[in-house]
């Protein structure tokens, strides 16, 4: 009997059904990735790669975080295969590694994969994702794959969705598919451009194969109408519809809008973000009537605080709670809180090792210095701010607080928290790297998750603020208040082991 090679078998399969097994030769980087099966972290990534645009879906008792795997300086021409991290508690992650590969061919549309969405319908998982290749036209298109176990996928190139005449072929990506019960149909939201504006288009389907262009779903209402609205999601939560996206420029914020109906009209609330610009590409998902958002905290070139921001980094997830008006607050997920509580690591009460006066160009300050934070832990703090606010400075060299360049500023009068990557003594002459709006009263309640160079501040059970600070580990830090304020603070640190 004549043997049929695997390549010939795949070719026959394509000719017969149009389907393609989602497999390819493994690069050395992917082989290394597959050898790492477990990651225990607040903000996971698999060693040797970084987490790009996540595609979260909760099913069968697990948070399944599909994401674009970023290998820097990899041996392949292709980039951003879709990988999977899964977890029940958002701390102990199983690394399923590569599940949907790129095609390592400069002439194939799937040379570079972009984000999309995954849903489970019956016993079948469906993935829609972006194919990107500047050597072909259109540069971007939407691909479809299915799986019975979420690990082994079959691609369906015959289901490829190309940009319509009204949309820009270089920007047609990030498909998000959702079942809309009121309409008895599936909707696909797509990041694209029309008439020079960044918009979200909508397609509809009743069978997940045949899609119909329904035009502009959401027109750009951000401060720059030509910005792309990336990574959209649409969910029904707490009696309302929520649309989220991340503006590609200039703010790079994961934003949300609220509506009573899936077609809108969409309201932009006073607080319309889930985090600052230290968090990007956030996508929403539901677990048992609870809402979550997953995005990534970027690294910086050369692991330097002064360098440019990279694409991709570490995964981060917040739980979101809605008030009576639909405004969302960002919280530590309950699952992660339980892990922290049950971890046998020690809890220490923190006391200042020294207090001193700090001179700045804007006001004299009093500063309390604290010992270095653990490489992984939770800081719980209550600090009184009787007048204008406070500053938390990290990565101190000796006792020189005024020279500290990593500063989180709580501005009470403006109701804002800022992250400055500039010296405290001249901070009034610099622009903040990121910021969020959050009401600040006489007291600040903080829970800060620390992991190596990452600190995510959860403020007053209201807001999350993600930061990357490479000079923070193994160095003292401080809290500073105006010189004549009374200093009252209670701080505890839980060390994760």
PLM feature segments, named:
Residues 381, 444-467:
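Carbohydrate-binding surfaces in secreted/extracellular proteins
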Residues 469-497:
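Ligand-recognition surfaces built from glycine- and aromatic
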Residues 423-445:
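Short, aromatic/His-centered strand-loop micro-motif at the edge of beta-sheets
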Residues 270-271, 366-372, 433-438, 467-468:
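Beta-strand-rich interaction surfaces with strong enrichment in secreted/lumenal proteins
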Residues 23-174, 179-225, 236-276, 297-355, ...:
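Beta-rich carbohydrate-recognition and catalytic domains
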Residues 8-16:
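Bacterial N-terminal signal peptides
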Residues 1-8:
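Bacterial N-terminal signal peptides that target proteins for export
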């Amino acid at each position: 009997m004549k043997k049929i090679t695997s390549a010939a078998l795949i070719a026959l399969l394509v000719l017969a059904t149009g389907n393609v097994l989602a497999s390819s030769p493994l690069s050395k980087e992917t082989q290394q990735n597959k050898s790492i099966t477990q990651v225990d972290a607040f903000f996971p990534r698999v060693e040797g790669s970084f987490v790009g645009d996540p595609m979260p879906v909760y099913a069968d008792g697990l948070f399944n975080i599909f994401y674009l795997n970023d290998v820097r300086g990899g041996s392949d021409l292709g980039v951003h295969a879709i990988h999977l991290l899964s977890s029940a508690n958002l701390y102990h992650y199983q690394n399923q590694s590569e599940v949907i590969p790129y095609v390592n061919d400069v002439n194939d549309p799937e040379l570079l994969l972009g984000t999309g969405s995954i849903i489970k319908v019956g016993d079948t998982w469906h993935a829609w994702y972006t194919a990107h290749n500047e050597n072909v036209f259109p540069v971007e298109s939407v691909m479809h794959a299915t799986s019975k176990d979420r690990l082994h996928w079959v691609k369906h190139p015959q289901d490829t969705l190309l940009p319509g005449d009204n949309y820009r072929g270089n920007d047609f990506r990030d498909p998000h598919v959702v079942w809309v019960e009121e309409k008895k149909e599936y909707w696909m939201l797509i990041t694209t451009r029309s008439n020079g504006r960044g918009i979200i288009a909508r397609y509809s389907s009743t069978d997940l194969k045949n899609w119909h262009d329904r035009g502009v779903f959401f027109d750009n209402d951000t401060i720059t109408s030509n910005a792309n609205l990336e990574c959209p999601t649409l969910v029904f939560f707490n009696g309302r519809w929520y649309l989220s996206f991340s503006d590609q420029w200039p703010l790079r914020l994961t934003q949300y809008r609220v509506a009573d109906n899936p077609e809108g009209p969409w309201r932009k609330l006073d607080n319309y973000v889930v985090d600052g610009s230290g968090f990007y590409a956030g996508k929403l998902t539901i677990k048992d009537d609870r809402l979550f958002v997953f995005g990534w905290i970027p690294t910086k070139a050369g692991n330097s605080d002064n360098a440019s921001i990279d694409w991709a980094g570490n995964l981060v997830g917040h739980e979101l709670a809605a008030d009576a008006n639909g405004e969302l607050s960002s919280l530590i997920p309950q699952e992660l809180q339980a892990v922290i509580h049950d971890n046998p690591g020690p809890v220490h009460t923190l006391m200042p090792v020294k207090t001193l006066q700090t001179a700045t160009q804007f006001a004299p300050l009093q500063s309390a210095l604290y010992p270095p934070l653990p490489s992984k832990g939770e800081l719980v703090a209550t600090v009184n701010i009787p007048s204008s606010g406070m500053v938390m400075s990290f990565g101190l060299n000796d006792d020189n607080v005024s020279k500290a360049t990593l500063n989180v500023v709580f501005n009470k009068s403006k109701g804002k928290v800022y992250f400055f990557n500039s010296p405290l003594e001249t901070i009034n002459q610099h622009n903040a790297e990121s910021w969020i709006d959050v009401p600040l009263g006489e007291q600040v309640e903080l829970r800060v998750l620390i992991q190596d160079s990452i600190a995510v501040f959860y403020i007053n059970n209201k807001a999350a603020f993600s930061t990357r600070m490479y000079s923070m580990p193994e160095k003292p830090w401080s809290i500073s208040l105006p010189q004549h304020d009374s200093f009252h603070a209670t701080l505890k640190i839980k060390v994760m082991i």
